[in-house]
Amino acid sequence: MASGSSSLMWFRKGLRIHDNPALEYAARGSDYLYPVFVIDPHYMEPDPNAFSSGSRRAGLNRIRFLLESLVDLDLNLQKLGSRLLVLNGEPSEVLFRCLKEWNIKKLCFEFDTEPYYQALDNKVKKYATAAGIEIFSPVSHTLFNPADIIQKNGGRPPLSYQSFVKLAGEPSWASSPISTELTSLPPVGSVGSCPISEVPTIENLGYEDTEEDDRTPFKGGESEALRRMRESIANKEWVANFEKPKGDPSSLVKPATTVLSPYLKFGCLSSRYFYQCIQEVQRNVKRHTFPPVSLLGQLLWRDFFYTVAFGTPNFDQMKENRICKQIPWKNDDDLLRAWRDARTGFPWIDAIMIQLQKWGWMHHLARHCVACFLTRGDLFVHWEKGRDVFERLLIDSDWSINNANWLWLSCSSFFYQYNRIYSPISFGKKYDPNGNFIRHFLPILKVVDHDLASKECKQILYEAYQLNKRLNGKVSEEDLKSLGRKPEEDKKQEQKSKRLKQTLLS
């Protein structure tokens, strides 16, 4: 036990030094500072029954990305005279022991909107309050406090981007520096009998490492996040003209987006700092794009989804979710596995799914294609099943955003133009006319035919083609009624889809 005033900084997300108000407050006036990260078995313990390497909740790529982020955080803390203390176990039990043994007077951690952390944080705060420990839990993972937006809207979250932007206005911190740069931190006090460890390796956690070819090319950590952001911001013309949903989902050498989403997910990069950097570019160019399509607009989309997710009970499911259409999706696990394991027989779809498995990341338009294909576009499989696959495999998997995107792309919420389908053929033909992207992830295909899947593809992916033959090419009248639409509205679309499938699967 250390004498003097001791603070504990509990890292979960927010794995950074810059713009970290919880860390700044923990350091202020403290003789000793304990920066802690808990290896939570809920997220990190290997699951031998999962369909891919990883834990019950996360694939190996995301676990590796997190570990890299922790190593980088530890190095950055050491530069300030501190270090990261890694402990293992159920987080609340670990924290209770640390708070007591280290005689902590101040507990600081970033506010988190996810239901899992809401329940965990309430448990920890109850214990800390009873022990007379000061608690500081600021909102710094998002641009705005979701609770403030919901309060402004009469107690319910806004359900359109436009209404959210109108309610949110300009962030209060936007016109002034968001934080002072830390130059030092209080030392770590005595850790007593608490079992402290270094940041574990993949092997330490009980996993077998994968070949280089099966690892994500994106390295975790604040240092890499800032490097990537500055590289993107340096191209002022690109920032000024950024316009989503434009972009090339087949780009391999240099992705057509910033690829900052995993760094924002883990808080290696502050969304507030990124926002200010974009603003600075916009102030120094003659013209630029505007929300919702601009780069700044993408950060606002992120906050919009966080706000809706935070204010909507059962947001991550169809049942008892008041904003989700109750659609009679198929619970066909054979079709799900064919999609998940890249065995649909559609080269464009399968190549994207292999990219997901290997990289843990895909361009947003690629995500749209495969999500639409699984749900309303072709297979009519429940969006929750696709959501679970993305949640496991994406390195940027974010509870609020992942669920929101699946609700959107399945036309279950936010977006209801059911007949706007991403064709598994023409979309690939448009963006990958020479088949370079497809052959990169499906090298066994020597020739890529976008109009008719090649015989070679049919032979290799025969199982998936047998599954696809069970489809009738259209949604039933009952299914369309559940969407609040008339069958005749989609007659042409259905006929076209049916002819296309019959051609492909004959």
Describe these PLM feature segments.
Residues 1-183, 291, 354, 389, ...:
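Trp/Phe/Arg-rich N-terminal binding region typifying the photolyase-homology
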Residues 22, 69, 73, 225-232, ...:
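Alpha-helical packing segments of well-folded alpha/beta enzyme cores
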Residues 55-62, 66, 218, 341, ...:
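Residue-level preference for long, well-ordered alpha-helices that form the structural scaffold
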Residues 98, 108, 127, 136, ...:
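Generic recognition of cysteine residues
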Residues 112, 411, 444:
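Short, loop-centered acidic/histidine patches that primarily coordinate divalent metals
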Residues 154-325, 428, 432-506:
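Glycine/tryptophan-enriched, flexible segments
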Residues 253-439:
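Active-site-proximal binding-pocket segments
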